[in-house]
Protein backbone atom coordinates (compact mmCIF):
# COMPACT_ATOMS: atom_id res chain seq x y z
CA UNK A 1 0.00 0.00 0.00
CA UNK A 2 1.25 3.47 -0.90
CA UNK A 3 0.85 6.09 1.83
CA UNK A 4 1.09 9.87 1.52
CA UNK A 5 2.42 12.36 4.06
CA UNK A 6 2.08 16.10 3.36
CA UNK A 7 3.67 18.81 5.52
CA UNK A 8 4.57 22.51 5.22
CA UNK A 9 7.51 23.58 3.09
CA UNK A 10 9.16 25.21 6.14
CA UNK A 11 8.15 25.51 9.81
CA UNK A 12 9.68 27.49 12.68
CA UNK A 13 9.24 26.86 16.39
CA UNK A 14 10.07 28.60 19.63
CA UNK A 15 9.35 31.82 21.53
CA UNK A 16 10.02 34.77 19.23
CA UNK A 17 9.91 32.66 16.05
CA UNK A 18 7.74 35.35 14.41
CA UNK A 19 10.96 37.26 13.76
CA UNK A 20 11.68 34.75 10.97
CA UNK A 21 8.71 36.12 9.02
CA UNK A 22 10.48 38.83 6.95
CA UNK A 23 13.15 36.42 5.76
CA UNK A 24 10.53 33.97 4.51
CA UNK A 25 8.56 36.74 2.78
CA UNK A 26 11.74 37.75 0.93
CA UNK A 27 12.73 34.16 0.16
CA UNK A 28 9.36 33.48 -1.43
CA UNK A 29 9.50 36.72 -3.43
CA UNK A 30 6.32 38.06 -1.84
CA UNK A 31 5.47 41.73 -1.48
CA UNK A 32 2.20 42.53 0.32
CA UNK A 33 0.07 40.64 2.85
CA UNK A 34 -3.60 40.44 3.57
CA UNK A 35 -3.57 39.74 7.30
CA UNK A 36 -6.45 37.45 8.26
CA UNK A 37 -7.21 37.63 11.97
CA UNK A 38 -10.08 38.38 14.34
CA UNK A 39 -11.16 41.44 16.26
CA UNK A 40 -10.23 40.03 19.68
CA UNK A 41 -6.64 39.37 18.62
CA UNK A 42 -6.42 42.97 17.45
CA UNK A 43 -8.13 44.30 20.59
CA UNK A 44 -5.80 42.45 22.97
CA UNK A 45 -2.61 43.24 21.07
CA UNK A 46 -1.71 39.71 19.99
CA UNK A 47 -1.90 40.43 16.27
CA UNK A 48 0.12 43.60 16.83
CA UNK A 49 3.13 41.50 17.90
CA UNK A 50 3.22 40.14 14.35
CA UNK A 51 2.31 43.42 12.67
CA UNK A 52 5.24 45.06 14.47
CA UNK A 53 7.56 42.60 12.73
CA UNK A 54 6.07 43.52 9.35
CA UNK A 55 6.35 47.23 10.14
CA UNK A 56 9.99 46.94 11.17
CA UNK A 57 10.78 45.09 7.94
CA UNK A 58 8.83 47.55 5.78
CA UNK A 59 6.47 44.87 4.47
CA UNK A 60 3.11 46.41 3.47
CA UNK A 61 -0.16 44.81 4.53
CA UNK A 62 -3.88 45.29 4.94
CA UNK A 63 -5.99 43.70 7.67
CA UNK A 64 -9.14 41.59 7.29
CA UNK A 65 -10.71 40.84 10.68
CA UNK A 66 -14.28 39.77 9.83
CA UNK A 67 -13.75 36.20 11.04
CA UNK A 68 -16.08 34.36 13.41
CA UNK A 69 -15.26 31.68 15.98
CA UNK A 70 -16.84 29.14 13.59
CA UNK A 71 -16.07 30.78 10.21
CA UNK A 72 -18.85 30.87 7.66
CA UNK A 73 -19.33 30.98 3.90
CA UNK A 74 -20.11 34.68 4.33
CA UNK A 75 -16.77 35.26 6.12
CA UNK A 76 -14.94 33.60 3.24
CA UNK A 77 -16.73 35.67 0.59
CA UNK A 78 -15.94 38.89 2.46
CA UNK A 79 -12.32 37.77 2.68
CA UNK A 80 -12.19 37.08 -1.05
CA UNK A 81 -13.38 40.62 -1.73
CA UNK A 82 -10.83 42.04 0.70
CA UNK A 83 -7.99 40.07 -0.90
CA UNK A 84 -8.94 41.12 -4.42
CA UNK A 85 -9.13 44.80 -3.42
CA UNK A 86 -5.92 44.77 -1.38
CA UNK A 87 -3.47 43.99 -4.15
CA UNK A 88 -1.80 41.52 -1.78
CA UNK A 89 0.06 38.50 -3.11
CA UNK A 90 0.00 36.38 0.05
CA UNK A 91 -2.17 35.66 3.07
CA UNK A 92 -0.83 36.06 6.60
CA UNK A 93 -3.07 34.10 8.98
CA UNK A 94 -2.81 35.11 12.64
CA UNK A 95 -5.09 33.21 14.98
CA UNK A 96 -6.54 29.84 15.79
CA UNK A 97 -8.19 27.47 13.37
CA UNK A 98 -10.83 30.03 12.45
CA UNK A 99 -8.39 32.53 10.96
CA UNK A 100 -6.22 29.90 9.30
CA UNK A 101 -9.18 27.95 7.87
CA UNK A 102 -10.66 31.14 6.45
CA UNK A 103 -7.30 31.94 4.86
CA UNK A 104 -7.17 28.49 3.29
CA UNK A 105 -10.58 28.94 1.69
CA UNK A 106 -9.66 32.42 0.42
CA UNK A 107 -6.37 31.17 -0.98
CA UNK A 108 -7.86 28.13 -2.69
CA UNK A 109 -10.76 30.01 -4.29
CA UNK A 110 -8.55 32.86 -5.48
CA UNK A 111 -6.52 30.42 -7.57
CA UNK A 112 -9.48 28.12 -8.34
CA UNK A 113 -12.35 30.56 -8.99
CA UNK A 114 -14.71 27.84 -10.16
CA UNK A 115 -15.24 27.14 -6.42
CA UNK A 116 -16.39 30.71 -5.68
CA UNK A 117 -19.68 29.46 -4.21
CA UNK A 118 -17.52 28.05 -1.34
CA UNK A 119 -19.94 25.17 -0.65
CA UNK A 120 -18.57 23.12 -3.56
CA UNK A 121 -15.28 22.84 -1.65
CA UNK A 122 -16.84 20.38 0.81
CA UNK A 123 -15.19 16.97 0.98
CA UNK A 124 -12.26 16.36 -1.35
CA UNK A 125 -12.54 19.11 -3.95
CA UNK A 126 -10.86 18.60 -7.31
CA UNK A 127 -8.85 21.83 -7.28
CA UNK A 128 -6.18 22.19 -9.95
CA UNK A 129 -3.98 24.93 -8.48
CA UNK A 130 -2.22 25.49 -5.18
CA UNK A 131 -3.51 28.14 -2.84
CA UNK A 132 -2.21 31.67 -2.81
CA UNK A 133 0.86 31.45 -0.50
CA UNK A 134 -0.21 31.32 3.15
CA UNK A 135 2.04 32.03 6.12
CA UNK A 136 0.30 30.87 9.28
CA UNK A 137 1.04 31.94 12.85
CA UNK A 138 -1.20 30.07 15.32
CA UNK A 139 -2.26 31.84 18.51
CA UNK A 140 -3.81 28.76 20.11
CA UNK A 141 -2.34 25.34 20.84
CA UNK A 142 -5.12 23.21 19.47
CA UNK A 143 -6.27 23.00 15.87
CA UNK A 144 -2.88 22.63 14.16
CA UNK A 145 -4.52 24.24 11.12
CA UNK A 146 -1.10 25.62 10.19
CA UNK A 147 0.11 22.11 9.25
CA UNK A 148 -3.03 20.34 8.02
CA UNK A 149 -4.57 19.82 4.60
CA UNK A 150 -8.02 20.24 6.12
CA UNK A 151 -10.19 23.23 6.86
CA UNK A 152 -13.73 23.64 8.17
CA UNK A 153 -16.23 26.28 7.05
CA UNK A 154 -19.82 26.57 8.30
CA UNK A 155 -22.55 26.58 5.67
CA UNK A 156 -24.93 28.78 7.64
CA UNK A 157 -27.80 28.32 5.19
CA UNK A 158 -27.84 24.55 5.73
CA UNK A 159 -26.53 24.66 9.33
CA UNK A 160 -23.66 22.28 8.68
CA UNK A 161 -19.91 22.31 9.01
CA UNK A 162 -18.19 21.56 5.73
CA UNK A 163 -14.99 19.62 6.22
CA UNK A 164 -12.77 20.38 3.23
CA UNK A 165 -9.74 18.21 2.47
CA UNK A 166 -7.27 19.51 -0.10
CA UNK A 167 -3.47 19.10 -0.30
CA UNK A 168 -3.40 22.38 -2.24
CA UNK A 169 -4.47 24.36 0.84
CA UNK A 170 -1.58 23.68 3.22
CA UNK A 171 0.23 26.84 4.33
CA UNK A 172 3.65 27.25 2.74
CA UNK A 173 5.13 28.42 6.05
CA UNK A 174 4.12 27.72 9.64
CA UNK A 175 5.56 29.88 12.42
CA UNK A 176 4.70 28.40 15.82
CA UNK A 177 5.61 31.11 18.31
CA UNK A 178 4.44 30.35 21.86
CA UNK A 179 4.75 34.02 22.81
CA UNK A 180 1.57 34.62 20.81
CA UNK A 181 -0.25 32.27 23.21
CA UNK A 182 0.76 33.71 26.59
CA UNK A 183 -2.38 35.84 26.95
CA UNK A 184 -4.80 33.11 25.84
CA UNK A 185 -7.56 32.88 28.50
CA UNK A 186 -7.63 29.84 30.79
CA UNK A 187 -10.86 28.48 29.29
CA UNK A 188 -9.56 28.75 25.73
CA UNK A 189 -6.20 27.22 26.67
CA UNK A 190 -8.08 24.25 28.14
CA UNK A 191 -10.47 23.81 25.23
CA UNK A 192 -7.85 24.12 22.50
CA UNK A 193 -5.46 21.87 24.42
CA UNK A 194 -8.08 19.15 24.64
CA UNK A 195 -8.85 19.67 20.97
CA UNK A 196 -5.20 18.81 20.34
CA UNK A 197 -5.52 15.74 22.59
CA UNK A 198 -8.59 14.68 20.61
CA UNK A 199 -6.59 15.00 17.39
CA UNK A 200 -3.80 12.88 18.84
CA UNK A 201 -6.06 10.14 20.21
CA UNK A 202 -8.39 9.96 17.21
CA UNK A 203 -5.40 10.11 14.87
CA UNK A 204 -3.84 7.19 16.75
CA UNK A 205 -6.89 4.92 16.59
CA UNK A 206 -8.47 5.97 13.26
CA UNK A 207 -8.78 3.33 10.55
CA UNK A 208 -6.12 5.06 8.45
CA UNK A 209 -3.43 5.11 11.17
CA UNK A 210 -0.05 3.46 10.54
CA UNK A 211 3.37 3.26 12.14
CA UNK A 212 4.60 6.69 11.07
CA UNK A 213 1.45 8.53 12.16
CA UNK A 214 1.34 6.54 15.41
CA UNK A 215 4.82 7.74 16.30
CA UNK A 216 3.76 11.38 16.14
CA UNK A 217 0.42 10.91 17.89
CA UNK A 218 1.93 9.04 20.84
CA UNK A 219 4.49 11.79 21.36
CA UNK A 220 1.75 14.43 21.15
CA UNK A 221 -0.31 12.65 23.83
CA UNK A 222 2.72 12.45 26.13
CA UNK A 223 3.48 16.15 25.69
CA UNK A 224 -0.11 17.27 26.22
CA UNK A 225 -0.43 15.14 29.36
CA UNK A 226 2.77 16.76 30.66
CA UNK A 227 2.12 20.40 29.75
CA UNK A 228 -1.60 21.21 29.47
CA UNK A 229 -2.48 21.73 33.14
CA UNK A 230 0.55 23.93 33.68
CA UNK A 231 -0.31 26.00 30.61
CA UNK A 232 -3.86 26.46 31.96
CA UNK A 233 -2.77 27.36 35.49
CA UNK A 234 0.41 29.30 34.65
CA UNK A 235 -0.36 31.07 31.35
CA UNK A 236 3.06 32.71 31.04
CA UNK A 237 5.04 29.54 31.77
CA UNK A 238 7.31 29.38 28.69
CA UNK A 239 8.08 25.66 28.95
CA UNK A 240 4.41 24.68 29.18
CA UNK A 241 3.27 27.07 26.44
CA UNK A 242 6.03 26.01 24.07
CA UNK A 243 5.41 22.35 24.92
CA UNK A 244 1.74 22.69 24.02
CA UNK A 245 2.54 24.68 20.88
CA UNK A 246 4.80 21.91 19.61
CA UNK A 247 2.51 19.08 20.79
CA UNK A 248 -0.52 20.36 18.90
CA UNK A 249 1.57 20.75 15.73
CA UNK A 250 2.92 17.21 16.08
CA UNK A 251 -0.64 15.88 16.49
CA UNK A 252 -1.67 17.80 13.38
CA UNK A 253 1.22 16.45 11.31
CA UNK A 254 -0.25 12.99 11.69
CA UNK A 255 -4.04 13.32 11.83
CA UNK A 256 -4.03 15.52 8.73
CA UNK A 257 -2.63 12.59 6.80
CA UNK A 258 -4.66 9.71 8.29
CA UNK A 259 -8.03 11.08 9.40
CA UNK A 260 -10.08 11.28 12.58
CA UNK A 261 -13.28 9.68 13.88
CA UNK A 262 -16.64 10.00 15.59
CA UNK A 263 -15.58 12.58 18.18
CA UNK A 264 -15.03 15.11 15.42
CA UNK A 265 -18.03 13.82 13.52
CA UNK A 266 -20.19 14.56 16.57
CA UNK A 267 -18.49 17.86 17.43
CA UNK A 268 -18.99 19.43 14.01
CA UNK A 269 -22.81 19.72 14.13
CA UNK A 270 -22.59 21.18 17.65
CA UNK A 271 -20.53 23.99 16.16
CA UNK A 272 -22.55 24.37 12.98
CA UNK A 273 -26.01 24.40 14.55
CA UNK A 274 -25.36 25.83 18.01
CA UNK A 275 -22.05 27.68 17.56
CA UNK A 276 -20.41 25.64 20.35
CA UNK A 277 -16.63 26.22 20.34
CA UNK A 278 -14.97 23.31 18.54
CA UNK A 279 -12.49 22.55 21.32
CA UNK A 280 -15.22 22.46 23.98
CA UNK A 281 -17.34 20.09 21.90
CA UNK A 282 -14.41 17.74 21.29
CA UNK A 283 -13.28 17.82 24.91
CA UNK A 284 -16.74 17.00 26.25
CA UNK A 285 -17.30 14.13 23.81
CA UNK A 286 -13.82 12.57 23.82
CA UNK A 287 -14.02 10.25 26.88
CA UNK A 288 -17.57 9.16 26.00
CA UNK A 289 -16.62 8.14 22.46
CA UNK A 290 -13.37 6.59 23.74
CA UNK A 291 -15.44 4.22 25.91
CA UNK A 292 -17.46 3.18 22.86
CA UNK A 293 -14.35 2.62 20.73
CA UNK A 294 -12.28 0.72 23.30
CA UNK A 295 -13.19 -2.83 22.16
CA UNK A 296 -11.91 -2.04 18.65
CA UNK A 297 -8.56 -0.58 19.72
CA UNK A 298 -7.46 -2.19 23.00
CA UNK A 299 -3.75 -2.33 22.14
CA UNK A 300 -3.78 1.36 21.21
CA UNK A 301 -5.58 2.16 24.47
CA UNK A 302 -2.76 0.51 26.42
CA UNK A 303 -0.42 2.89 24.58
CA UNK A 304 -2.67 5.85 25.45
CA UNK A 305 -2.72 4.84 29.12
CA UNK A 306 1.08 4.73 29.13
CA UNK A 307 1.36 8.09 27.37
CA UNK A 308 -1.06 9.61 29.92
CA UNK A 309 0.96 8.07 32.79
CA UNK A 310 -2.12 6.07 33.81
CA UNK A 311 -0.83 2.56 33.11
CA UNK A 312 0.15 0.33 36.02
CA UNK A 313 2.23 -2.84 35.73
CA UNK A 314 0.09 -5.94 35.40
CA UNK A 315 -3.01 -4.23 34.02
CA UNK A 316 -5.04 -6.18 31.50
CA UNK A 317 -5.78 -4.48 28.20
CA UNK A 318 -9.32 -3.80 29.35
CA UNK A 319 -8.09 -2.28 32.63
CA UNK A 320 -5.61 -0.12 30.74
CA UNK A 321 -8.37 1.06 28.40
CA UNK A 322 -10.51 2.05 31.39
CA UNK A 323 -7.52 3.86 32.90
CA UNK A 324 -6.89 5.72 29.63
CA UNK A 325 -10.49 6.92 29.40
CA UNK A 326 -10.52 7.94 33.07
CA UNK A 327 -7.24 9.84 32.69
CA UNK A 328 -8.68 11.84 29.80
CA UNK A 329 -11.92 12.53 31.67
CA UNK A 330 -10.13 13.63 34.85
CA UNK A 331 -7.80 15.93 32.90
CA UNK A 332 -10.85 17.49 31.26
CA UNK A 333 -12.49 18.06 34.65
CA UNK A 334 -9.34 19.51 36.20
CA UNK A 335 -8.97 22.13 33.47
CA UNK A 336 -12.61 23.16 33.73
CA UNK A 337 -14.29 21.70 30.65
CA UNK A 338 -18.12 21.35 30.87
CA UNK A 339 -19.09 17.70 31.20
CA UNK A 340 -22.68 17.77 29.91
CA UNK A 341 -24.31 19.06 26.74
CA UNK A 342 -27.11 20.53 28.84
CA UNK A 343 -24.56 22.96 30.31
CA UNK A 344 -24.04 24.31 26.79
CA UNK A 345 -27.73 25.03 26.24
CA UNK A 346 -28.44 21.95 24.12
CA UNK A 347 -31.95 20.51 24.56
CA UNK A 348 -32.68 16.79 24.61
CA UNK A 349 -35.01 17.13 21.64
CA UNK A 350 -32.04 18.41 19.60
CA UNK A 351 -30.13 15.13 19.91
CA UNK A 352 -31.72 13.17 17.02
CA UNK A 353 -31.00 16.05 14.65
CA UNK A 354 -27.39 16.16 15.84
CA UNK A 355 -27.03 12.39 15.44
CA UNK A 356 -28.26 12.51 11.85
CA UNK A 357 -25.74 15.23 10.98
CA UNK A 358 -22.89 13.50 12.81
CA UNK A 359 -23.50 10.19 11.04
CA UNK A 360 -23.17 11.99 7.69
CA UNK A 361 -20.00 13.88 8.69
CA UNK A 362 -16.86 13.19 6.66
CA UNK A 363 -14.84 12.34 9.80
CA UNK A 364 -17.16 9.63 11.11
CA UNK A 365 -16.18 6.82 8.67
CA UNK A 366 -12.63 6.91 10.08
CA UNK A 367 -13.89 5.73 13.46
CA UNK A 368 -12.10 2.51 14.50
CA UNK A 369 -15.35 0.83 15.55
CA UNK A 370 -18.23 0.72 13.09
CA UNK A 371 -20.88 3.14 14.27
CA UNK A 372 -24.53 3.69 13.36
CA UNK A 373 -26.76 6.75 13.66
CA UNK A 374 -28.47 5.00 16.58
CA UNK A 375 -25.09 4.49 18.31
CA UNK A 376 -24.32 8.18 17.88
CA UNK A 377 -27.68 9.17 19.35
CA UNK A 378 -26.95 7.01 22.42
CA UNK A 379 -23.54 8.65 22.80
CA UNK A 380 -25.12 12.11 22.65
CA UNK A 381 -27.59 10.96 25.33
CA UNK A 382 -24.68 9.85 27.54
CA UNK A 383 -23.09 13.25 27.00
CA UNK A 384 -26.31 15.07 27.81
What are these regions (language model features)?
Residues 273-350:
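Gly/Pro-rich interdomain helix-loop hinge
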Residues 74-176:
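Glycine/threonine-rich beta-strand-loop-alpha-helix active-site module
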Residues 1-64:
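An N-terminal, well-structured beta->alpha segment
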Residues 347-384:
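Short, amphipathic C-terminal "tail helix"
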Residues 142, 249-282, 361-365:
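Glycine-rich phosphate/pyrophosphate-binding beta-alpha loops
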Residues 42-115, 230-241:
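N-terminal small/polar loop signature for handling phosphorylated ligands or for N-terminal nucleophile
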Residues 150-258, 374:
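Carboxylate- and glycine-rich phosphate/diphosphate-binding segment that chelates Mg2+/Mn2+
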Amino acid sequence: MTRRFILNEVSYFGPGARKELPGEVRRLGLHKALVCTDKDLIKFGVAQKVLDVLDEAGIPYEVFSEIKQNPTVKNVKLGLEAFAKSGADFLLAIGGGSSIDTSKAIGIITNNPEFADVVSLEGVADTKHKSVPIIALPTTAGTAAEVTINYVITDEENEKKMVCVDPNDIPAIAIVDAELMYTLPRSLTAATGLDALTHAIEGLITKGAWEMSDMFEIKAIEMIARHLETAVNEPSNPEARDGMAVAQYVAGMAFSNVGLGAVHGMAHPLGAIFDIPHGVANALLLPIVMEFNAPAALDKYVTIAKAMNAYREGMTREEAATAAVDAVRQLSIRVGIPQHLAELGIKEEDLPRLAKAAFADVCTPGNPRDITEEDILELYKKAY
